[in-house]
Amino acid sequence: GGFAFDNVSAALAAYRERLPDMLSLLKALSLAELEVEGQFVEQLHAPIFDGMQSQDFTAAELQFFPDYLVALDSDAPGVQADLANALSSGMPVKVLLEVRDLLEEAAPGQGRFSFGMRGSQLASMAMTFGDAFVLQSAASNLLQMRDRLQRGLRHAGPTLFSVYAPADGESTLPGYLAAASAMQSRAFPAFSYDPGRGPDSATRFSLENNPQPDVDWPLEFLTYADQDLQAVTEELAFTFVDFLLADRRHSRHFAVVPRAHWGEGLISARQWLESPPADAATGLPYVLAVDDADLLCRVVVDERMMRAAQRCREAWHRLPELGGIHASRAEALL
């Protein structure tokens, strides 16, 4: 048997089967150290070693043995229970959670998206185990996170790597760009929770490499030529709505507006999210896109998508709270 598994039950079974031999070796090594140092007293130490159980050994001692790698699919039934079982089992485990889809409907007839449910929420849940190292990142950001990845691999306790690697076919973008846009739009932000960094959640938690983390949405300048071929520069926010626009399954929630109807009734999605209009008819939200003729166009967004963007923003705001940052700052002020 090896040390790589695609389900938690098989990994736990292998670990428990090998545990007696591991404990025997640890006892023998500990006994040998005492004998070499001339400190072994049979009447004192022999009963102690005879009564040792698995819980008497620490994660640091178990790290001399190979870790168990468990690869999980976030779409698999019961993945939340499997993940909790793996991280609380005491097994030296590295869990790779592969997130393929962030925009799947929660259930037929429900007007909500389960975006990030199997990714961000599972990774956030893992932080509650305290001694677990947690890293979440889009696949496009893994190179930038290599130092954190190495820390997670060296961590003596359980480790979770939650990675968004989008499946081909759903997005109009190549996989690498789809992953990058998920992180850019706050749909799948990168963060880490490292128990080795300090005693409290605020020092352990870090928002990793997210663009402009102090604002709701990253802002960039776009320069384009208008109808008179004059250069126009506009500041744009890349929101969750922009991420949604690239997903073919949700095209029915968008509509291109002919240039002749670019009137005062349209407001940018960024403006709508900052201050939703009381009367929807007076402020239809839109995002910019490029059509097949490489011309800039405006695409209006229905309210359902805008509400999904609001929930995405709320989840982004909750991340520091989950990491204990705000609570620790409040305690410091008191």
Regions found by a protein language model. Give the residues of each.
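Flexible, low-complexity linker and terminal segments
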Residues: 1-19, 169-334
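Anionic-ligand anchoring segments at beta-strand to alpha-helix junctions in alpha/beta enzyme folds, i.e.
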Residues: 2-44
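Phenylalanine-focused residue identity feature
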Residues: 3-5, 40, 49, 57, ...
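Thiamine diphosphate
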Residues: 28-110, 120, 124, 133-152
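Core active-site phosphate/anionic-ligand binding loop and the adjoining beta-turn-alpha structural block
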Residues: 90-206
